[in-house]
């Protein structure tokens, strides 16, 4: 059985030269969350260690402030708050 190889991904925060991640900016955080609102690992997002840690802190703050749900039922996965308006 062969191992699945992931393509090289680059940290979008480093490339965009972002200096601060705000927990209220859900559009920026949604790229690091799965459809069930779990934090995706670095190997899938391509974030560097520094930015992955900062994103995790911002997501945890957003969850604490009730901007992002902690857990999601399978029935509620269809209704995403990140829909484009």
Swiss-Prot record:
NCBIfam families: S18. This is Small ribosomal subunit protein bS18. Signal peptide: none annotated. GO terms for molecular function: small ribosomal subunit rRNA binding; structural constituent of ribosome. PROSITE patterns: RIBOSOMAL_S18. Gene3D superfamilies: Ribosomal protein S18 (4.10.640.10). GO terms for cellular component: cytosolic small ribosomal subunit. The keyword Ribosomal protein applies. Binds as a heterodimer with protein bS6 to the central domain of the 16S rRNA, where it helps stabilize the platform of the 30S subunit. Part of the 30S ribosomal subunit. Forms a tight heterodimer with protein bS6. Keywords: Ribonucleoprotein, Ribosomal protein, RNA-binding, rRNA-binding. Belongs to the bacterial ribosomal protein bS18 family. GO terms for biological process: translation.
